[in-house]
Every structure is written in structure tokens, then in C-alpha cells.
């Protein structure tokens, strides 16, 4: 399958000095290239151009924020050479005062993240169900900004924490901004927004000690789980591979809430959205996620940056699930319950368009940290339902950003600005840049001809769906099926392969092993005995409590769409570590690297020292990194070439360490003819996923096929 927009041969290692040393060599470090790539010229990018400032370069002089040229930015003004600093040193005062105010409050949740710009292209018209302009004409392209994030940890936590991920998208449409706030799980942790603060308090670090960071491996989190059992489905997702994605480019995402589409005739259709990655859905192992968090806490950020700068643009298809108003009560789950998913086998996903991310931010603080997403930022044709979580989310996001960004003028910040004209009477507040020259700023008025005027719905004004609402004030749950906490978690378990089930048990064991309270551990085992008795019994044995007394709920259905075994597999953008020394077979290695390069595989050349390694035919290959600076867990596959180095014993030891860990993690390993000695001859035919080049004319194809498969679970 050809992934549209993928540009092969860009910064995949600069492998051969003689062939590739100058090929796109400077692109990764060239900041201006961020604005010159094909497809980057859209209305949002053009709008941002007027805010971009370059402060360095020939002829640029250092000034104050008032335009004063600075003669000395190194030493403060003192009374005598060894005297005290003088208060009249206004430059030092202003410099330090600004520094003292450079940080803004971090997000309570989703604090750690990163973002990119791109565009969404519609495949097919959705005119029959919605009047939203950007969903009308096939081929319509809409600029977007996407922010990926971790939920639990602080801004400085690790990317690979076992956690739910945020996937928030801002569409800059011709009718104003539309924000779609998605998560990497299809279900949420609470049924009602009232409980969200309690959930966050429980999973955050202990308020007395401020530990642990970015994890639910502590007593408070699991005490909450055991006593708020609506969270069971969410926890099953968290304990699965979905809680540790291989890459932001390889994870699905759902807004989890139920919305309405409204068409031009006023007809309402219930809708849920889903983003599906073109590269398939793939995960790290628990062991990998924990190790990577220590050796490269920026793993997902780095992966996003490298992919975009290489031209391997992340792509996702947008799908919708639609339910007619008259069918909302025909299912065994409530369509307004965010702890329940809509099974794809019951309510099919209709793919309607594709999003491509093709440009990184210019300034992390100005764009990624100041971006604001709000579920209540919608466009005509998209409306709310009585989803209890959505009702709370619809005001909470903007409220928290009023505090975090310190202004009511959030949409004046460039990344948040719509690409259409804005005219409103809410004009003042902190950091107001626009100079409004009107004397009238209220509605209705006669002095300004009652302008700016309202726009009727038939001409593009927003109007809420006229849903009939009646009943008494109550704090009851919306429906009886809200009380069914375990049927869908059981379906999720039934949908997993034996390997996925074992990984879920191991992840439970890892987290519950940190829980000190035996009572809490027992409560959790008893709770998840409702999901699967055998699973809970295996967990109980590991964490030292009794097995559950009750049997699991009698649900036999499954959903194949939930298993990652049924996802797409490609070699594209898989990352291969080439372990190499001097004296390698130049013809063989060049042939293999050329083929990997052609297939879009990312390559790192690893050896004892930086510089170059030389083959038996004189060919030189530039080394990207050294064994001391990298780790096997950072790669999807190994190509073991071997060779000669100055410190032969350490070189062989490093290779064996890489191979041992990659094999332990079920990863594919390609073995060059010069590296056969690293493997026991008697076991070569029994090493699943290990491909040998010796006497193998099909080595290239077999190795690339193994890279695409990614894991070999049948290893002994």
C-alpha cells in the first residue's frame, strides 16, 4: 500500500558517504524548510506568517521590548567594580522580571504534549446528514492543528507512561473553528462530568508526597477504581496495549462523546467520530514502555518530529458512526453513556476523509502551549446531545483556559485564531491586541444600525437543535443500562488474542504490585472477577490475595475491531538499528540498505565510534550514533552486520546485548553473512523472526516482511 504524502529517501540515516551524504542533508536542521514543503500553503499558514518573527541573523541588533538598543547584556550595573548592583539598572530589572513570568499554569490534565499542523480532505459528501460546510464537497481541504498529549503526568513527565492519550484537532473552517477533542480509548472513565474531578484527584500523585508521577501504580488510583466500578471498561483499555502506543502516528482516537449531525432540513442524526491511523494501531510492550521512559522520555515527540521532517507525514482517516433518532433505544447500551462504545460490527464506521499532518510548530510555547481546545467550539450542522459527560465538558475546557492563559481573548492568540472574520462585543480583557474603533459595543443598538447583525440559521447562523425536553429535576442516571458496568469490559476481553490477554494480566500485576493496601488489592480482584474469572484469578495469585468468589458476567460476544491483531501492518517508517563495524560485505550491505531505504524504513547506523565504517570494497557508511548513546528498545528491528572495531570484545558484547533484548521483545532481526557467528548454528532454523542472509537470495524481501510483521509471538 502506498501511503500518500510519504516521501522516501529523506534523512533516513545519510548512510553512504559516496551516495547519500549530501542528499537532503540539511533539511532536518533548516528551520525555513518548515514553510517551504509542498502542501503547506493554506489559509491558516498564510495567516500565521504575519506573526512570525526572526530575531537572529546578519545585521540584527539586540534591543529591549521598547526598541532600545542594548550595549551590554552580560554584566549588571554596579557601584564600583566589586560593589552592589544598582536598582537603576532597568535592563537587568526588566530582563529578570520577564523571566519570572515566562511560565503559565500548566494544564491540570493533558499537561505534556506536542502538536503539528496539517489539513483534512473530505472523501465524500455528508450533506445528507449535516450542513457543516467542511463536510459538504468531496475534495474540500480544511487546515488543522492537532495536539497529542498524555493525560495523567505533569509537563515534564515521560511520553511512554501507561496512560490514555489526548488527540485534539482544531479545524479552521470557513464557518469558524471546530474543535474535536478525542482520546486514544473509545470509552471514558466516568459517566457524569460531576465525577471527573474525583477521578483526576485519585490518579494524580499523592497530595502528601507528590509521588508517584504519571502512573496509576498507587493506592489512591486503585481505591477509586474499586469503589467507582463504572470505570471497569476504561481500565481494561488502560491495561491493554492501547495504554502504551508505539507512536502517536499509530493510535486510534475517539471523541468518546455522542454528538448530533443536523442537516439543512433540520433532521438530527446521532454521531460518534473516530480517527484511524493509516499505518495501523501498534503498541509497545510494558517492559519497553518502562525502559524507554527512562532512556528517552521524549520518545513520542521525537518520533513525530522525525517523521514530519522526513516527509513521512502522519495520516489518519476520519470515520463516523451514525444512529437515527428513532433507533436510539434499540441497543443493549445507552448511546449517551461514554463508558460504553458503539461496536463497529453493530454500528459500522463510515470513512469520510483523511487528515495529513505536514508541518511542525515554529515555537512550542507560542503555539503548542497556548493552543486552546473547547468541545463547545462547533460549527453549524454539529450540535450537542444530553450526553452527561459532554454537558460538563462543554463549559469546563474554556473555563480552565481562561485561568491558564490569563485572558478572555483566547482566540486572539495566533494558533487559536479562526481564518474567518470575527465581529463581537466581548472586546476587553488582558492582552488585547486588536484596536476596535467603534463607539458602540452592545446589542441591540440603533446608533450603529444594530450592527454587527445576527445571522439567521438559513444564512449560516448557528442554531441549536430544537429537542423536546421535559421531566422533573433529578440526579438520577439517564437510563438503566448505565448500571451495566461489566458487559462491555467482558466483550473487550473476549475480543483479545491470547497474547493480548496475557499482556493485560501482566499490566494489572505491574500496577497492583505497587498497591500497599491488601484490602484495595482484594477489592480490585473481586471487581474484575466480573469481567473474567480466570483473568482475576491469575492477578490474585500474583499480588497475594484471594481469587474472586463470583463468576464473570455471562457475555460471549466479541468485537474483532478491538484487537490490534486485526490492524494493518507495513514496514513504512519502522525504525531499524544497523549494528556495524569495519570490513563488512560492501555489496551485500549496500544492497540491503538501498532496499530498506526504498521501502521507507527509517535507519540508524550504530557502531563503536562516530565517524565512518569502511566495507571490504572501500565503501564508507556514516555512523549516526554509538552504542553508549542508544538502546535496543528504541528500535523496531535490528540489522546485525558485525565487523571489526578497535575494542572488539566490547563491540561484540554490545551487539549481543542488543540482540538479546530485541529477541526478548519479539522483534525481527536481520543477520548479514558477516554476523552469523553471533548466533548458534544449531538453533538457526528455530529462531522465529530472525532472517539470515547467508545462502538466502530472498533475504531482502524476507527481512522487510519480518519488519512489517513487527512481532513474532511464537518465539520460545
Positions of the model-derived regions?
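Hydrophobic residues within alpha-helices
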Residues: 591-592, 658
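Surface-exposed, charge/polar-rich loops and edge strands
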Residues: 601, 688-689
Amino acid at each position: 500500500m502506498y501511503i500518500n504524502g510519504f516521501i522516501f529517501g529523506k534523512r533516513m540515516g545519510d548512510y553512504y558517504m559516496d551516495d547519500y551524504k549530501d542528499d537532503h542533508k540539511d533539511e532536518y536542521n533548516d528551520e525555513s524548510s518548515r514553510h517551504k514543503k509542498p502542501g503547506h500553503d493554506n489559509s491558516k499558514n498564510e495567516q500565521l506568517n504575519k506573526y512570525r518573527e526572526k530575531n537572529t541573523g546578519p545585521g540584527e541588533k539586540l534591543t529591549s521590548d521598547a526598541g532600545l538598543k542594548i550595549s551590554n547584556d552580560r554584566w549588571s550595573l554596579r557601584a564600583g567594580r566589586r560593589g552592589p548592583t544598582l536598582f537603576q539598572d532597568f535592563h537587568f530589572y526588566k530582563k529578570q522580571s520577564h523571566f519570572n513570568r515566562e511560565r503559565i499554569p500548566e494544564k491540570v490534565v493533558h499537561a505534556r504534549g506536542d502538536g503539528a499542523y496539517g489539513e483534512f480532505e473530505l472523501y465524500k459528501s455528508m450533506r445528507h446528514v449535516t450542513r457543516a460546510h467542511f463536510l459538504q464537497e468531496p475534495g474540500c481541504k480544511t487546515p488543522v492543528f492537532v495536539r497529542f498529549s498524555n493525560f495523567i503526568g505533569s509537563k515534564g513527565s515521560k511520553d511512554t507512561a501507561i496512560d490514555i492519550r489526548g488527540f485534539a484537532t482544531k479545524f479552521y473552517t470557513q464557518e469558524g473553528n471546530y474543535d474535536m477533542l478525542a482520546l486514544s480509548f473509545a470509552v471514558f472513565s466516568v459517566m457524569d462530568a460531576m465525577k471527573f474531578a474525583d477521578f483526576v484527584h485519585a490518579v494524580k500523585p499523592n497530595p502528601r508526597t507528590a509521588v508517584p508521577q504519571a502512573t496509576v501504580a498507587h493506592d489512591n488510583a486503585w481505591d477509586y477504581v474499586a469503589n467507582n466500578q463504572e470505570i471497569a471498561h476504561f481500565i481494561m483499555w488502560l491495561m491493554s496495549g492501547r495504554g502504551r502506543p508505539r507512536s502517536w502516528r499509530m493510535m486510534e482516537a475517539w471523541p468518546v462523546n455522542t454528538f448530533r449531525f443536523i442537516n439543512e432540513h433540520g433532521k438530527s442524526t446521532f454521531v460518534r467520530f473516530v480517527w484511524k491511523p493509516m499505518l495501523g494501531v501498534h503498541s509497545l510492550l510494558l517492559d519497553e514502555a518502562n525502559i524507554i521512559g527512562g532512556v528517552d522520555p521524549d520518545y513520542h515527540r521525537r518520533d513525530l518530529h522525525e517523521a514530519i521532517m522526513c516527509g513521512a507525514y502522519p495520516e489518519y482517516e476520519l470515520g463516523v458512526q451514525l444512529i437515527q433518532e428513532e433507533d436510539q433505544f434499540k441497543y443493549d447500551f445507552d448511546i449517551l453513556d461514554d463508558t460504553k462504545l458503539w461496536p463497529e460490527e453493530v454500528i459500522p464506521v463510515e470513512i469520510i476523509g483523511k487528515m495529513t499532518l505536514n508541518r511542525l510548530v515554529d515555537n512550542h510555547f507560542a503555539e503548542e502551549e497556548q493552543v486552546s481546545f473547547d468541545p463547545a467550539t462547533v460549527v453549524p450542522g454539529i450540535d450537542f446531545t444530553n450526553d452527561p459527560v459532554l454537558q460538563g465538558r462543554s463549559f469546563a475546557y474554556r473555563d480552565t483556559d481562561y485561568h491558564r492563559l490569563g485572558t478572555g481573548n483566547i482566540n486572539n492568540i495566533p494558533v487559536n485564531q479562526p481564518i474567518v472574520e470575527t465581529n463581537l462585543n466581548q472586546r476587553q480583557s488582558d492582552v488585547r491586541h486588536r484596536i476596535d474603533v467603534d463607539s458602540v459595543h452592545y446589542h441591540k443598538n440603533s446608533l450603529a444600525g444594530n450592527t454587527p447583525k445576527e445571522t439567521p440559521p438559513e444564512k449560516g447562523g448557528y442554531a441549536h437543535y430544537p429537542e423536546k425536553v421535559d421531566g422533573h429535576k433529578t440526579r438520577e442516571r439517564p437510563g438503566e443500562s448505565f448500571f451495566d458496568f461489566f458487559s462491555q469490559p467482558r466483550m473487550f476481553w473476549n475480543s483479545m488474542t491470547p497474547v493480548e490477554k496475557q499482556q493485560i494480566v501482566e499490566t494489572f500485576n505491574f500496577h497492583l504490585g505497587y498497591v500497599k493496601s491488601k484490602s484495595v488489592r482484594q477489592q480490585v480482584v473481586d471487581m474484575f472477577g466480573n469481567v473474567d474469572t480466570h483473568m482475576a484469578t491469575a492477578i490474585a495469585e500474583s499480588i497475594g490475595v484471594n481469587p474472586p468468589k463470583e463468576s464473570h458476567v455471562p457475555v460471549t460476544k466479541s468485537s474483532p475491531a478491538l484487537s490490534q491483531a486485526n490492524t494493518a501492518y507495513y514496514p513504512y517508517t519502522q525504525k531499524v538499528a544497523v549494528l556495524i563495524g569495519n570490513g563488512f560485505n560492501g555489496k551485500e550491505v549496500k544492497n540491503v540498505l538501498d532496499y530498506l531505504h526504498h521501502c521507507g524504513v527509517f535507519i540508524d547506523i550504530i557502531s563503536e565510534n562516530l565517524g565512518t565504517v569502511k566495507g571490504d570494497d572501500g565503501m564508507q557508511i556514516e555512523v549516526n550514533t554509538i552504542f553508549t548513546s542508544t538502546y535496543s528498545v528504541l528500535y523496531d528491528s535490528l540489522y546485525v552486520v558485525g565487523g571489526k572495531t578497535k575494542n572488539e570484545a566490547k563491540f561484540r558484547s554490545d551487539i549481543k546485548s542488543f540482540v538479546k533484548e530485541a529477541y526478548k521483545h519479539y522483534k525481527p532481526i536481520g543477520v548479514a553473512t558477516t554476523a552469523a557467528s553471533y548466533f548458534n548454528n544449531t538453533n538457526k532454523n528455530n529462531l522465529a523472526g530472525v532472517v539470515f542472509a547467508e545462502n538466502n537470495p530472498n533475504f531482502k524481501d524476507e527481512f522487510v516482511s519480518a519488519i512489517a510483521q513487527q512481532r513474532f509471538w511464537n518465539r520460545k
